[in-house]
Every structure is written in C-alpha cells, then in structure tokens.
Curated annotation (Swiss-Prot):
GO terms for molecular function: potassium ion transmembrane transporter activity; symporter activity. This is Probable potassium transport system protein Kup. The keyword Cell membrane applies. InterPro entries: K+_transporter (IPR003855), K_trans_C (IPR053952), K_trans_N (IPR053951), Kup (IPR023051). Keywords: Cell membrane, Ion transport, Membrane, Potassium, Potassium transport, Symport, Transmembrane, Transmembrane helix, Transport. It comes from the Archaea. One of its GO terms (cellular component) is plasma membrane. It is found in: Cell membrane. Pfam families: K_trans (PF02705), K_trans_C (PF22776). Transport of potassium into the cell. Likely operates as a K(+):H(+) symporter. It is a multi-pass membrane protein. The keyword DNA-binding does not apply. It catalyses: K(+)(in) + H(+)(in) = K(+)(out) + H(+)(out). It comes from Methanospirillum hungatei JF-1 (strain ATCC 27890 / DSM 864 / NBRC 100397 / JF-1).
Length: 611
C-alpha cells in the first residue's frame, strides 16, 4: 500500500485558491503598511525628497526581494511543489559532492530555521500592538495610557494562543475573504489619497531611490533597516507553497502587491500634504472618513490577528519538519484537522511562543521600539535563502538564474548589513531567541551521533545468525512482540539484549523501521513476513511533513501485538555538553508518547551509555 501526495499544478488557479492564498500567506506583508512609513519618518525628516525616495525604495524592495527572489526564483526550484528552508536543503544536499559543502549548508539551514523562529516572536507583537495603537485616533481616546494599549494587545495575543488547541480549520475559511477586504481597503484609501497628490506616482522611477542615498549618505544606508519592514513575511510565500500551490500564491501576489503599494503611495501623498503626522495610515484614513475609522480599526485588528495566526501555524510547521528530520527532539504533536495535513498543534511550542510574545510586548511597549528591533532575522533568513538558490542553480548549471540569484542575494546582504545597526536598539532579541533553537539543534544532533556510535548496533547478518540460533533453542512467549529499529542493517543494542541476553523471544517478532524521506509528503509501507521463522519486518517510509498514524498502519498490516519494546538510554557523562543533551532527552516526550503507542503494552529497555 502506498500513497503519495503532492500539490497540483494549475495553469489558471481558481478564485477560491487565490483568495485563500491572500488570507494565509500575505498577512505579514499586508499589515506592514500599518507601521513601516510611520517608523521610517521617526528616523528621517519627512522632506519631499525623503518621501519620494522612501516610496521608490519600497517599490523596488517589494519588486526585487519579494517578486524576483521568491515568486520568480525560489518557486521554480522545487520539483515536488514544496517550499521552505528544509526543502532547499533537501534539493541541494544530493547535488553536492564534497562533505564540507554538505556540512556548511546543513549549518546554514539550521541557522535559517532558527532565525525564522526568532523573527516569528516579534511579528505577532508588532502587528497586534501597532493596530491597537490606532485607538488613539478615536476622539476622546487621544490620551489613553500606553499601559492600557499594552494590556489590550496582551489580551488579544493570549486569546490567540488559547485558541490554537481548538484548531483553525473552521475559521480559516474566513481568513481569505477578510484579508481581501483588508487589501481592497488599503488600495481604495491609498488611491483616493494619491488622487490629491498624483505626483507621488513618479516615485516608481529608481532615480528617486538613488537621490535618496546621495542626499542622506550613511543615514540613507541605515534607513534600509526600516525600509525592509515592507517585505517582512516574504519567506512565507515560499514556505507555504506546498499546501497552497505555486500559481495561487503568484496570482494573489499580483493583487496584494498593487494593493499594498498603493497604500504606501497614499500614505506618502498624505505626508507630502501633512508633514507633521505621527502615523500616516491612521491619520489618512481618519481624514478620509471619520465615521468609517472605527470599522477600519476593527478590520485592521482582525487582519493583524490573521497575520499572527499564519505566523504561529508556520512555526508549528517548521518545528514539525525539524522533529521528523531529527534536528529537534520529539515533542507531542496534536492534529487539529482531518482534512488539512498542515493543521497541527504543538503545545510546548505554543506556550513558549505565547510567553515570548507577551515578554516582548512588556519589554518594548511601543510599536516603534519593536520596529527598531525588527528586521535582522528577516534579512538574515533572506540572505540564507539566496545562498541556497545560488548554489542550486550553479549545481544545475542554470547560469542565467544563478546570476539573477547572485544580484538578489547581494541586495539581501546589503539590507542585512543595514539591520546590524539594530542590534543595540533591540535587534539582539531576535538573535537571542534564534540562538536557543540553534543551540538545541547543534547539541541534540551531535549527541544523537555520539549516542549512535556508542550504542554499537549489530549488523544484519550477525543478527540473523544469532536470532536463528536463539529462536530454535529458546522458549517462545505467546503472542507477537514489536521492536523498533531504523533498519535491519543496523539492529539496535536493546533488541539483541532483549532477545539474546534476556532470552525474551515471542512466537512472532516484528521489527518496525521508520524511514524519513527527503520529500515532504507521501508514505508507503511494506510488510515482509518471510525473513526467518517468527521474524518479520514492517518498513514504513514517509515524507518529513507527512503525518502518520503508526498504530493504524500496524493494524492495516494485520499485526495484533501483545507487547511493544523500545530502547531507552541512561547517559553517564562528565561533559557539560552531553549533560545538557541528557537533560533534553529526559525532558522531551518518549518515542511512545510521540507515536501514541498503547502504554499498557509498552516495555522500555534501558541501556547505560557512557559519553
């Protein structure tokens, strides 16, 4: 029995799929107009030259870093229709010939994942807080204390994280239509404002971006760290390609690009007419219609919640990939949808993320301070994605695409260097957060390798020879016993100890091996009953994003077990790194809990290992 699932390619995606992509992918980019120009012009004087130059830079940033890098280059790389950092790693590693290159890009992939996690802590905080601060534009609420706004933002964030366990399958159907209304609102309000100052349309000309740097010098370079806020969330275009499809995302981006850019144009036009504003989006909307401002504010808060939800779902997906590819230890995963393969919930991650977001809100307190800390991890992730693209196109000898990727990556690195200046203004936070999963991955993977070497698994031929002899002479226990191993070629020490040292051999002994494939989705299994008398092998192969029900597969294979054995390690060490590794192993759920094996049938076999 086998099944393989890949995203379908459509020449003309349906309107439903495009609307769904608009809701699930572009929340972060779609809410960036709330704060990008407001923060930039706290940093720069709002002169006509700076306003024209800033809008010009925003246009070319969206065009180069989002349109070219992700919708044009990155999306053509995956042959299976999947996206994300680990997918790029899976594409590149088989193409590399030197082990040193494999090690470097594996480390880069780990760094990229860690930076995305660091970025995703700040995203919900800045999105929700910046929207809530719009309350001050309502007459009578101009002097509301910031503490109350922070409290409201924390309540919204807490409600969002409390809601995760229930799953978002039902409400996610409304995300697309709501975000389409949001984008239409951005476009219409921006277009009306542009009509009063049509000269702002000239900002598309890159000469204004060049003049911006000439006039501002080094200050102009550091301004890129604020300009890049318009492109936050670009990685989601590529990462979400697997379950939404390339074409719906590309078509949706055409609509979103126009809507978002017109909002920037409208805000810039409003700034040309009113240079003393604090937040051009809020004040522009209020000036257009005071009556509609409160509905707009409510819509904006909902849009930021949807954007935050997409980020949280993305984190669950990244962590799940890292678990199945053995980069992170096993964490209990709940499946919140019977239909959508990507709808998962990881309780530990959810509450750690919730605590981190609330701490960020309490530490920074103002959206402009959060903006000053935001962007370093974003540009770092983009630079890593660009490096992978260059290497893949080079290995495939697609030199034209490689050249384009090289130019784009140089732009990414330029933005990254500009955001380094944010480290002293709070940018260190995303690095500190990213350092936590990065350190855990390095320690865990190194520990697993050391553990594997110390455990000294038994080879296939030696195991079969000893098993045949033992099965003939030993007294058989009634029923069927299950054992878990990576493969029959390397049989874990706990199996040989159980069968040969402790002489525990059942009438039927089934060794189950789980093989994680390089492809994201699809699974197959094969049950070989004829290895030796009383010995069978169930091999299960599945993609690193595929969700499997292990006990259901065992039942489908016709196996009715009496006992399930699995290996446990007692690590003895004086090395501080291995002590941390041992603590990680103890704190994380066991193999039994992860795969939801029936606890009353399970027996753990402890092996003492010195590292």
């Amino acid at each position: 029995m086998s099944r393989r699932t890949i995203s379908k390619t459509m020449e003309h995606p349906s309107k439903t799929s495009i609307i769904k992509a608009a809701g699930l992918v572009f929340g972060d980019i779609g809410t960036s107009p709330i704060y990008t120009l407001a923060v930039l012009f706290l940093f720069l004087p709002p002169t006509p030259e700076n306003i024209m130059g800033a809008v010009s830079l925003i246009f070319w940033t969206l065009l180069i870093m989002v349109t070219v890098q992700y919708t044009f280059l990155a999306m053509r790389l995956s042959e299976t229709g999947e996206g994300g950092t680990l997918v790029l790693k899976g594409i590149l590693i088989p193409l590399l010939k030197k082990p040193k290159g494999v090690a470097v890009f594996t480390l880069l992939a780990t760094l990229g994942i860690s930076l995305m996690i660091g970025e995703c802590v700040i995203t919900p905080a800045i999105s929700i807080l910046s929207a809530v601060e719009g309350v001050r534009q309502i007459p009578g609420f101009e002097l509301i204390a910031q503490d109350w706004l922070i409290f409201l933002a924390i309540l919204i964030a807490l409600g969002l994280f409390l809601f995760q366990k229930r799953g978002t399958e039902g409400v996610s159907r409304t995300f697309g239509p709501v975000m389409v209304i949001w984008f239409l609102t951005l476009f219409i309000s921006g277009a009306i404002s542009v009509a009063f100052s049509p000269e702002i349309l000239l900002a598309i000309n890159p000469i204004y971006a060049v003049e911006f740097f000439i006039h501002n010098g080094l200050l102009g370079f550091f301004s890129l760290s604020m300009i890049v806020l318009c492109a936050t969330g670009a990685e989601a275009l590529f990462a979400d390609m697997g379950h939404l499809g390339r074409e719906p995302i590309q078509y949706a981006w055409g609509f979103v690009f126009i809507a978002v850019f017109f909002s920037y144009l409208g805000q810039a036009a409003y700034l040309l007419r009113n240079t003393d504003v604090i937040n051009p989006l809020f004040e522009m909307i209020f000036s257009l219609s005071q009556i509609l401002y409160i509905p707009f504010l409510l819509l904006m808060i909902i849009a930021t919640i949807i954007a935050s939800q997409a980020v949280i779902s993305g984190i669950f997906s990244i962590i799940y990939q890292a678990i199945t590819t053995h980069l992170l230890p096993m964490l209990p995963v709940d499946y919140t949808s019977d239909e959508l393969r990507t709808q998962i919930y990881i309780n530990t991650v959810n509450w750690l993320l919730c605590i981190a977001v609330i701490c960020v809100l309490l530490i920074f307190q103002y959206s402009e301070r959060l903006a000053s800390a935001y962007g370093l991890a974003v540009t770092g992730t983009m630079s890593i994605t660009g490096s992978f693209m260059i290497a893949i196109f080079l290995q495939r000898r697609k030199y034209l695409y490689m050249g384009i990727a090289l130019i784009v990556t140089l732009v990414d690195i330029t933005y990254f260097l500009s955001t380094v200046s944010k480290i002293t203004h709070g940018g260190y936070l995303s690095l500190v957060i990213a350092a936590i999963p990065f350190t855990i991955v390095i320690i865990y993977t190194s520990g697993q390798r050391a553990l594997y070497r110390s455990m000294k698994p038994m080879g296939h031929d030696q195991f079969i020879k000893k098993y045949t002899r033992a099965y003939k002479t030993a007294r058989h226990l009634r029923g069927t016993a299950l054992f878990f191993a990576r493969s029959l070629d390397q049989v874990p020490a706990y199996i040989s100890r159980t069968m040969f040292n402790n002489e525990i051999i059942y009438e039927e002994n089934v060794i189950i091996s789980l093989d994680i494939k390089d492809e994201p989705y699809g699974f197959s299994w094969h049950f070989d009953k004829s290895i030796e008398p009383g010995l069978s092998h169930l091999s299960i192969s599945y993609g690193y994003m595929q969700i499997i029900d292990l006990m259901r597969i065992i039942r489908d294979a016709g196996i009715e077990e009496k006992t399930i054995f699995y290996g446990m390690e007692e690590i003895v060490t004086r090395n501080i790194i291995w002590k941390i590794f041992s603590a990680i192993k103890r704190l994380c759920p066991s193999f039994v809990q992860y795969y939801r094996l029936p606890s009353h049938k399970v027996h753990g076999v402890i092996t003492r290992v010195e590292l």
